[in-house]
């Protein structure tokens, strides 16, 4: 049904200038959730963005605005009056307003802040003081706070009076007179409480999982995965409650981190823009530097081949198997690296696990290498008709290459973590470049020994 509504909306927009059926357009928009409406906005020309946005129901407009990409948000802001912009800013959650300010150019930021009310402006400025990738940078200050001496009835009344403007009321956070976090109580517990005169201190859970304002956002997202929370409280150095991180922010963090890791693992500069929103120049800048670096790194393989030209000249058939060996080594190393990076990303693997990693990877590598070597040996003798010594050289190299590649693939991400470098950088392209050179060294030295070159 949603797809039908979207298509109907797009058809009406195409003929809007002629039809002027604004009420019909509004009726269709009211049937669509904010993410679907935002997808329609992304495809509109800049001059139609304000027209459609003004038709959004008031309670939906802020949600649609939040779902838009920064580029589309800026185009829309440029088409809104100051009064309309103020209405949008007033409806945004503080963390979303802070994200907006961080993404916009200075002239747009100045206009946004000038339209925000003093309280919102103060909270935005407070959040901007925290590092962007920290819990403080992604938290919201709009939370439901209770006191331990409140009764259930008083707490429910406080939620009814103040809960409308909060990010979430599923969990209410209990603080003492100094705003120090002492417990958490769920709305579920309050609703089901049999005695409305019971104090909150008797219902609250005092074993609260919290993070500090400086906790890395990726670590925060892992807590959501581990405990299944909908929100996590954020405290300062003195355990005073300053905000919460909600599940929607955690999902955004995981998506951003995954996108960044995938880009780095494929030697592409990360970008927060959708593919079709990136210009040719953006794509060029994200790829060319890495390609240049990898091309220069690959010259080591050329130097190795040049150093063993005599061996290749003596047994030219060896040249035919270089691509197979380097590809096998690169693939094995990439498999190992991807597995280790994934384990580190979800907290399963720590740097001190390196000895266990090497032990496991070496055994797996020997099994994989032996399997490939046996199959390859038969293929070389039966189909390629090479001599047994040449087949032995290729297969011994294959086993050694698989072993070395998987060990390198296991070591580099852990080393990167110890050096405080993103492990994703030590991924497929870089591993392949390193393994190519080492594979050739192994190949030619095995050939010299076995073939007496």
Language model feature labels by segment:
Residues 304, 317-336:
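Hydrophobic, small-residue-rich transmembrane alpha-helices and their short perimembrane loops
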Residues 34, 290-298, 321, 325, ...:
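Alpha-helical transmembrane segments in multi-pass membrane proteins
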Residues 295-312, 375-386:
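Juxtamembrane "helix exit" motif at the C-terminal ends of alpha-helical transmembrane segments
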Residues 122, 249-283, 334-357, 414-420:
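Non-transmembrane, extramembrane segments of multi-pass ion/lipid transporters
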């Amino acid at each position: 049904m949603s797809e039908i509504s979207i298509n109907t909306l797009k058809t009406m927009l195409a003929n809007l200038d002629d039809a002027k059926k604004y009420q019909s357009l509004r009726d269709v928009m009211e049937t669509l959730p904010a993410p679907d409406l935002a997808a329609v906005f992304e495809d509109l020309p800049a001059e139609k963005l304000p027209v459609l946005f003004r038709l959004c129901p008031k309670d939906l407009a802020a949600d649609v605005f939040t779902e838009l990409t920064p580029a589309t948000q800026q185009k829309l802001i440029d088409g809104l009056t100051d009064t309309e912009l103020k209405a949008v800013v007033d409806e945004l959650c503080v963390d979303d307003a802070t994200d907006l300010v961080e993404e916009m150019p200075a002239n747009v930021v100045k206009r946004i802040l000038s339209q925000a009310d003093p309280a919102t402006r103060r909270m935005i400025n407070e959040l901007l003081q925290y590092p962007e990738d920290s819990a403080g940078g992604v938290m919201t200050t709009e939370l439901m706070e209770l006191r331990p001496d409140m009764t259930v009835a008083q707490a429910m009344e406080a939620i009814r009076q103040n809960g409308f403007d909060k990010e979430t009321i599923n969990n209410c956070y209990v603080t003492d007179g100094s705003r120090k976090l002492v417990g958490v109580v769920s709305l579920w517990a309050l609703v089901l409480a049999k005695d409305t005169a019971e104090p909150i201190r008797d219902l609250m859970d005092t074993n609260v999982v919290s993070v500090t304002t400086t906790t890395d956002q990726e670590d925060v997202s892992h807590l959501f995965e581990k405990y299944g929370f909908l929100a996590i409280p954020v405290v300062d150095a003195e355990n005073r409650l300053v905000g919460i991180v909600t599940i929607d922010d955690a999902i955004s963090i995981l998506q951003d981190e995954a996108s960044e890791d995938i880009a780095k693992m494929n030697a592409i500069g990360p970008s927060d823009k959708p593919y079709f929103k990136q210009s040719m120049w953006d794509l060029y800048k994200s790829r060319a530097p890495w390609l240049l670096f990898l091309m220069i790194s690959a010259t080591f393989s050329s130097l190795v081949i040049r150093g063993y030209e005599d061996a290749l000249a003596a047994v030219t058939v060896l040249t035919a198997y270089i691509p197979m060996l380097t590809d096998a080594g690169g693939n094995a190393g990439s498999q190992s690296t991807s597995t280790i990076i994934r384990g580190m990303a979800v907290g399963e693997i720590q740097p001190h696990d390196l000895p266990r990693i090497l032990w496991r990877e070496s055994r797996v590598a020997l099994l994989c290498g032996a399997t490939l070597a046996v199959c390859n040996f038969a293929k070389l003798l039966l189909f390629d008709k090479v001599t047994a010594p040449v087949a032995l050289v290729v297969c011994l190299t294959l086993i050694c290459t698989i072993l070395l590649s998987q060990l390198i693939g296991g070591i580099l991400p852990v080393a990167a973590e110890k050096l405080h470098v993103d492990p994703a950088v030590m991924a497929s392209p870089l591993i392949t470049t390193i393994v190519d050179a080492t594979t050739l060294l192994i190949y030619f030295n095995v050939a010299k020994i076995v073939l007496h070159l």
